[in-house]
Amino acid sequence: MSIFLPMLGVVVTILAGWAMIRRYQTHIVLLFSGLILVAAAAFLAGVDILPKGVKPSGFAGFDIFNLLVSIGKKQASGIGFLIMAAGGFAAYMERIGAANALVRITVSPLRKLNSPYIVLVLGYLIGQLLVMVIPSAAGLAMLLLVALYPILKGVGVSPAAAVAVIGTSAGMTLGPSSGTANLAAKVAGLDPIIYFVQYQLPVAIPTLIAVAVCHYFVQRYYDRKGDDVYQDADQVQAKEVPSVPVWYAVFPLLPIALMIIFSKLVISTVKLDTIAALFLVWVLVILVELIRLRSP
């Protein structure tokens, strides 16, 4: 049994990857993959699958779905709210033309590189640097969706490739501000800075290079295979957007700037949550719109 369960996990992971490559609905694939693994843990290994504080129903089959309910409630109030806030902020940035202003300013010089996938790799490296000051993977992903995603689409990268890069930007939790790195340093009996410089960086740098190279070739291969990259970019450019001042391009970047300022790098005495940063900038932009147009 001790060998069977890990092997089952490997098989389910491979099958899930195959199903997603074959373009089966991702949510359904992940749901059933998780249910299979949880059911195996409950019925075959006799593991208590319920989180702390959740009372068992008396039947493991029901507890599987009680686990889903418990996780759903927790995620809806945490990551779920973050996704809704970031989605609303991104939609508002697009509606007022701020996202398009950012794309307009950045795309022209970036296109001179003559390779959208070089820009894609740079976006990945920027995201990985930002994770050192914004250690929340979900928070960083939402901020990059607002600021980086439209730029990558504008230079001709497919939405799938852009999201793949954003999704892996927080793949390595680097730096002394990371909770994982701090825990590892504590267990090892090292200062977090020493742990970061002497132990994390020697492993992280070659890993970053390897992932960046893989992104370049893998995303380019699948974009060419899908043959939808430039068609999508044309649709983005052709979409009618409001005419706004050039300085509106700053607004999508402001939440990231605020998160960097109110971090251990600059002002460590004040902490700013990702959602709070989004709402703060949102309110500021509404006030600017009221002054400029007398309409939000």
What are these regions (language model features)?
Residues 1, 70-85, 197-209:
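Hydrophobic alpha-helical transmembrane segments
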Residues 1-4, 107-115, 167-168, 241-244:
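Short, amphipathic, aromatic/basic-enriched membrane-interface segments that mark the entry/exit
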Residues 19-29, 152-161, 293-295:
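Membrane-helix interface "capping/anchor" motifs
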Residues 29-37, 162-169:
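Central hydrophobic cores of alpha-helical transmembrane segments
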Residues 127-144, 149, 154-197, 207-216:
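Alpha-helical transmembrane segments and, especially, the helix-loop junctions at the ends
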